[in-house]
C-alpha cells in the first residue's frame, strides 16, 4: 500500500510555468500558522487537513512522522479507572468496526482476537524474538504481503541518515533554526540581520558564503546560487533528483521537520504583502542548504523509504491474543494464513486506540446528556432579575457563573468575549493597535482610548519614566562595557526583589501592582466611537450610527436578550493574572486575540448606553428601559474576582443591583476559587482561605501552574441558560446563549458555529494535540524552556519553535494527564430541522462533523437528545 501525500496534487505540473507557488501552497496545509507567544492564539495543528478524516490524518502522521495522535494506552487505562469510559460503548464501537470490514474469518474468532487485543497490552518481547515464531515467519515467506507495504517520501537528509547513520537531518535543522532566529527576531538583539528588509532568502544568500559552520565545499555549492527564491527552490529540487510527481510530498516532509518554525513563517507570510512569499523563501533556504550538505552522497538509488511489513508481530498477535499455536499455523491452508495476517494488520494499534477514543467520547456525551436531562426545567417562566451579566463562553466562566447565580437574583449569559465587535484597540498613550477579536477574523474598526490633551501629556510622561528605566537596564545588559558593571549596580536591588518575591509573593506582588498604578495615575478616558472620515490608517476610526446599532442588535439577539432587561446589565470580559509566565497570553481571552476582554466589554456597554442606539433599537422592537444601565467588568480567571472597569451613573434600581453584586462577590470568589484550586496537584488538604491562595498563585514568580486554563474542555453548549443552569459542568463546557425561537432564518446559529464554534474547536484540538503528542505538538516543560527572539519558546537554544501548550497545562504529574483528550462535542438546543439546515448550508461544518473533527448532538424543544 503506497502512502501518498495527504493532499491531492497535480502530477502533470511543468516546473517551467512557475507552478512551484501552487505546490508550496498545497503543501503548507500540513502545518498550522503559529502566532507569537505574546498573543498566543489557539490553533489546532490539522486545520488544513479537515478534508480528510481524523482517522486518515492519524494514519498518515504515524507513517510519515511516527507521530501518534490517539490517546496512549496509559491515558486510556487511567480514564477507565476513573469511570470515564463505559465498556458497553467500546463493545458497540468494536461491533460497528467489524460490520464495516470484509473478512473470511468466523465472527466469533475475530471478536475473541479483538477483545484480547483491546486490552492494549504490548506483545511480549520474548514472543517476538522467539526462534520458533521467527522460523515460522521464514517458512511462510510465500505469503503475499504486497498489500501491506508502505512507501513514504522523506527528505533526502533523513533518508541518508537512516541508511548511513549520518546525522544529516539534525545538522540541517541546526542551520535552519539559526537562520530563522536571525531573520524573525523581534526583540532579542540590538543588531538585526543584514539585508533583512530584502527578505529572508536574499538576506540569507548575502551571508551564507561567510558562514564558518559550513565546510568549504558546502559554501562552494551555494556560492553562485540563484538570486530568486523560486528559481533556487526549483533548482535544488532538480539537483536532488525529486521528480515532479513527488515534489509536494517532499515539501510536506520538510515543513513537518520543523513545524514550529515553519508555522511561524507561514503566519508571518499572511500578515503583510511584503512577506507573502516568505514560506517559499523558507523552503528555498532549507532545501538549498540540504543540497549543499547531502551533495557528497548523491545520487541515491531510491528516494523513498519502503516500509516492509514484518509478519512476525502479526503471527505473534494471533498466538498471544488469538490462542493459535505455531503447530496450528503450519497446518493452515495458505489462504487462511493470509486472511489472518491481513486481519491482524487491519486491526492495528491505531484502530484499537480509535475504538477506545470513541468509547471515551460516547461515555462523556452520555454523562452530559444525563446531567442535562436531570436538571431541565421550563424556560418560559422567567422572573425579573436584579442584574444580568454576560460572560465570555470560556470554560472558566462556567463555575463562576454557577456560584454567582446560586448566591443572588442574577441571570447570566454566554457570548464570545469580543462581544461581536470587529475592532482593533489602541489603549491610552499607545501607538500600536491590537486586533481584539478572534484570529480567524480581521478588524473593521479602530477604537482609541482618549482623554484631554493635558491629562494625556502628563500620563505619557509618567509612562516614559517607567519605560526609560527598563530600556536603560536592557541597554546596559547588552552593551559590552556596561554589562560588566551591571551586576554590582543592580545586584542589591534585584537580590532584595528575589528574596521578597520568593517568600512573600502575594504581599510583594500586590504592593508592586498598586505602586505601578499609583505612579501611572491613568486618567479617566473615553473612546473614539464616532466614525472619522479622514484617517491615514488602513482601518477607519470609530463607527457610523448604523454600525453602532447593528453591532449592539446582533449581540443582543445572538444571546436572546431582547426583552425583560434587568436594571443592571454587566458585560464581563475576562483576563488572567500571573507572574513570570511566557504563556500569559494563553490564559487571556482567545476571542480577543490573546488579550484581556475588558476593552471590548467597556466599548460595548458604552454603545448600549447611547441614546441614539437605544432609540434605533426601540424602533425595531428591542425596548431597553430607561432605568436599565449597562456597565462593564473584567472577570479575572486566576483569582475569580470581578473588577469593575466602567460604571456610569446608575439609576436607583441599578444601584441596588450593583450593591448586591458587590456584597456577595467575596463569597462567589471563595467558592469558585476553592472549586478550582482543589483541582491543582499542589493541593491535597483543605484550603482555609481560597482567595488568598489564588492571589499567591497569581503573584508567585516560581509558580509553573497559576491556573489550569482551559484544560479538560470537552463540550460547547449552544442554548438557553435554563438548559444547564443547575448543572455542575465542572468547568469543562463552553456556554453560548441561543434562543432558536428568535432565529427563524438560522443565521444566528450559523454565525455562532462559524465564529465562536470554530474558536472553541481550535482551543479543544490544541489541548488535545498537546496532550497526546507533547513531544511534537506540545512545548515541553516550562522549567527548561527558553524564550527566543520575542516569538516563542524552545527547549535549549537549538530546538524547533514549540507550537503547543506546556506540560504543566495538561499534565497532573509525570505519569497522569489532567486534560482528557476528547474531540469537542457541540450540543445545540434547537429543533432537528435547524440542525439539518445548518449542515446543508454550511459545507465546512458538515465536513468537520463527517470527518470526525468535532462531534455534534442536539436537544429538541421536548428535551430529546440526538447524536448526529
Swiss-Prot record:
Task: Point out the gene that encodes the protein.
Answer: dabA
Q: One GO molecular-function annotation for this sequence? A: zinc ion binding
Q: Which residues bind Zn(2+)?
A: 392, 394, 574, 589
Query: What membrane topology does the UniProt entry give?
Result: Peripheral membrane protein
Protein name per the record: Probable inorganic carbon transporter subunit DabA
Instruction: Tell me its family.
Output: Belongs to the inorganic carbon transporter (TC 9.A.2) DabA family.
An example of a Pfam family matching this protein is: DabA
Domain of life, source organism? Bacteria
Keywords, A to Z, come to: Cell membrane, Membrane, Metal-binding, Transport, Zinc
* InterPro entries to which the protein is assigned, alphabetical: DabA
Gene Ontology annotations for the cellular component aspect, listed alphabetically = plasma membrane
Asked if the Swiss-Prot or TrEMBL record annotates the protein with the keyword ATP-binding, the reply is no
Write out the function statement from the record. Answer: Part of an energy-coupled inorganic carbon pump.
- Where found in the cell? Cell membrane
**Cofactors (names):** Zn(2+)
Quaternary structure note: Forms a complex with DabB.
Keyword Zinc in the entry? The reply is yes
